Amino acid sequence: AASDVYKRQAWIDAVEYTDGMSETNEDRHPKRDLALDTLMGVLNGEILVQNHCYRADEMAMMIELSKEFDYKITAFHHAVEAYKIADLLADEGICAALWADWWGFKHEAYDMVQANVAIVDQARNGTGCAIVHSDDPVGIQHLNEEAAKAMAAGNRAGFNISKAHAMRWITSNPAKAAGILDQTGSIEVGKDADIVLWSGNPFSVYSRAEKVLIDGALAFDINDPKIQPITDFDLGIIQPEENRVQ
């Protein structure tokens, strides 16, 4: 309850600050506040809200708060219980960035189902906006496989989700949530040519990325050592030597 009061007070302050900053007479502007500047950007529609929530009741509460103060939530992240309010998310045009099959690591992350992504996606006759995400440095390198797992779970649950449709979960839907769908996220004339060419089915663990283009420029070529960026990221999770089991 105390947290709810704090959130509401922050938005009340932001509304007053925004009203003050809109005064034509700059002498009447309030003292500059960087935190309130950010909330003012949200109220003015200049900043997209990426809201971190696990539970359905928390997401519903944040939606009510956004309506009270007239701002838009673009996406909920982690959203383990998004399947419980999938229709509400679709009605409000809110995306949900979700893990394929990771949950149970803390109390608010207990109540998930493997078809979470598919249920959000298929809400309101398929108008939901689901995103398969990872905030893990290893998992992000296998995001196509994470999407494949979510697609398989959805189809096991009775949904008929094609590979082409599931590809949106890691392409156009994230671009939509980031506010850059007009620039990237799909292959269309006029958009940035951000493209990966695979050796086979992108959802197969046996497929490899053969070429990567970023804004139309070749950034990676599996057959050309000169176009293979060097990374200092070690694949896999390696414990420091002093922490390894002897």
Regions found by a protein language model. Give the residues of each.
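His/Asp/Glu-enriched, well-ordered alpha-helical/loop segment
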Residues: L48, D87-A90, I94-W198, L218
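Flexible, glycine/charged-enriched surface loops at secondary-structure junctions
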Residues: Y17-A35, F76, T184-G185
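Short, small-residue-biased leader/transition segments that mark boundaries at the very start
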Residues: A1-Y6
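Catalytic beta/alpha-barrel core
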Residues: Q50-Y54, K72-E81, G104-K106
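Active-site environment of divalent metal-dependent phosphoester hydrolases
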Residues: A56-A60, A79-A86, G139-Q141
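C-terminal cap of metal-dependent C-N hydrolases
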Residues: E188-F233
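Conserved, well-ordered alpha-helix/loop/beta-strand core segments that scaffold catalytic motifs
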Residues: A56-M61, L65-F69, T74
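Hard-cation-handling environments
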Residues: M21, K31-T38, V42-L48, Y54
